[in-house]
């Protein structure tokens, strides 16, 4: 019986330490741009010509280029170069001052008035006063500022063509440096009219933009806080 009890104690202690170690580990990063980051153009079977002057149009004209039109990507699988020009800054400040003053004065008769002549007391000597003064002051100030700058180039692929002609694009760039890999992921919706003749479009002209820049090196793991540490930080009184 003693051995069985000792075995259970060791089992529970081992499980407890495993949970503690896992809780102190870093939390897995959830990608901002999820899913496959490329698109392949589907195989389109061309319509068979029947000799008529009015031919049925192929759903997507891959390789077709109008005579008087600049070449612009507009089909699934086409590539577009995005010029990253993100420069965002924000600031916020607040202050508050609270003051509260309170004062109370209470007079109490020590002895009955009929005993004043016997004790030789006048009316004023037969009273005692209780004064209470309270004051509460609070002053608080806070400020917050953030500035993010992201510049560069990334070539993305047209993933889908929306019914109104806008292009849903997605792309990823990976750069291996020493023992870590840098990931740049991008997704958004492009209006084909914003694509210039060099097949470039600014990131500021793209809707529903998702830009992610992460790495899987050791420094990135060190900067993450485990869920147990975050829980203890929330309930800590200091």
From Swiss-Prot:
Does this UniProt record's set of keywords contain Coiled coil? no
Q: Name one GO cellular component term.
A: cell outer membrane
Positions with an attached lipid (S-diacylglycerol cysteine) read 24
The GO annotation for biological process reads:
bacterial-type flagellum-dependent cell motility
* Topology relative to the membrane: Lipid-anchor
Coiled coil spans: none
> What are the subcellular locations of this protein?
Cell outer membrane; Bacterial flagellum basal body
Lipid-substituted positions (N-palmitoyl cysteine): 24
| Origin superkingdom | Bacteria
A Pfam family the protein falls into = FlgH
* A single MF term (Gene Ontology): cytoskeletal motor activity
Q: Which UniProt keywords apply?
A: Bacterial flagellum, Cell outer membrane, Lipoprotein, Membrane, Palmitate, Signal
Q: Which residues form the signal peptide?
A: 1-23
Family assignment from sequence similarity:
Belongs to the FlgH family.
What HAMAP family does the annotation carry? FlgH (MF_00415)
Its assembly, as annotated, is: The basal body constitutes a major portion of the flagellar organelle and consists of four rings (L,P,S, and M) mounted on a central rod.
Q: What does this protein do?
A: Assembles around the rod to form the L-ring and probably protects the motor/basal body from shearing forces during rotation.
- State the PANTHER family in the record: FLAGELLAR L-RING PROTEIN
According to UniProt, the name of this protein is Flagellar L-ring protein
What is the primary gene name for this protein? Answer: flgH
């Amino acid at each position: 019986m003693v051995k069985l009890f000792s075995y259970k104690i060791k089992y529970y202690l081992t499980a407890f330490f495993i949970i503690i170690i896992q809780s102190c580990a870093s939390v897995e990063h959830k990608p901002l741009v999820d899913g496959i980051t490329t698109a392949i153009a589907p195989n389109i079977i061309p319509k068979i010509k029947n000799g008529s002057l009015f031919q049925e149009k192929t759903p997507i004209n891959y390789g077709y280029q109008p005579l008087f039109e600049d070449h612009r990507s507009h089909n699934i699988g086409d590539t577009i170069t995005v010029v990253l020009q993100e420069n965002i800054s924000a600031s916020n400040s607040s202050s508050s001052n609270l003051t509260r003053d309170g004062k109370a004065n209470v007079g109490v008769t020590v002895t009955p008035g009929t005993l004043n002549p016997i004790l030789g007391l006048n009316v004023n000597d037969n009273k005692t006063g209780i004064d209470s003064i309270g004051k509460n002051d609070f002053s608080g100030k806070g400020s917050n500022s953030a500035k993010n700058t992201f510049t560069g180039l990334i070539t993305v692929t047209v993933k889908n063509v929306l019914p109104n002609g806008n292009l849903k694009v997605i792309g990823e760039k990976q750069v291996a440096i020493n023992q870590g890999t840098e990931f740049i992921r991008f997704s958004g919706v492009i209006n084909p009219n914003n694509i210039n003749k060099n097949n470039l479009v600014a990131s500021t002209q793209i809707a529903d933009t998702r830009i992610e820049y992460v790495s899987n090196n050791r420094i990135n793991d060190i900067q993450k806080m485990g869920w147990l540490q975050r829980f203890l930080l929330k309930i800590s009184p200091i």
